[in-house]
């Protein structure tokens, strides 16, 4: 079952990875030209116009845009969070519903294995695919930065790991939600909504202390990119919260899936 599930999801993994790598490739090819001395001055002047709250929200107050690595720290890794978050949400909302959606549920009924095993096999495929996407992006960006100029390697490695913390929780939340329906159309919108709302809440929470509490409702808070940029370390509390939330939603998924009427 694991091999069948892995092969089925391999195509989407390749498509998502290829498109994302193509975007980053364009950045590395075009950035040296865009950031000529004159353009760099213009961008610096433009940045000064932005309110401080906006600069903080996009880490532009602690990361200069005059290099590809600076762009990665301010906007690039936000893009990675969104891409990996959307991919994780879509996979979480689809992977348990594939047979029901395709009207091939008899395949699962005929398997001599428990439903818990079915869930764990599908979860394993999801974890491998999400990790692979993040790993490939990290390796590609490492090569791109090595060619384009100097960068803090330790900081970069930690930044490349942080999307896992938010992506895994997103995956398990959407996986749990999928146990309440039989159609992927219903869960797809919800999963993307969770990602986009989380991003908006996380962005707004960084703009003012009055709304800082919003970050506690966002999965992207777990990635904590700003802390990594400032301290070159990942807050262990975020790792613990990510693992605990993932395990809780996995347990809830198993319980609910075992009770679900498969049609």
Predicted regions located by residue number:
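A structural motif at transmembrane helix-loop-helix junctions in multipass membrane proteins
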Residues: 164-196, 204
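Aromatic- and glycine-rich beta-strand/loop motifs that create alpha-glucan
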Residues: 1-21
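Hydrophobic/aromatic residues in alpha-helical transmembrane segments
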Residues: 85-92, 140, 172-173, 219, ...
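Transmembrane helix boundary and interhelical loop/hinge segments in multi-pass membrane proteins
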Residues: 89-109
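Terminal transmembrane helical anchor/hairpin motif
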Residues: 9, 26-69, 180, 193, ...
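Secretory targeting signals
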Residues: 120-179, 233
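Long, hydrophobic alpha-helical segments
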Residues: 72-95, 192
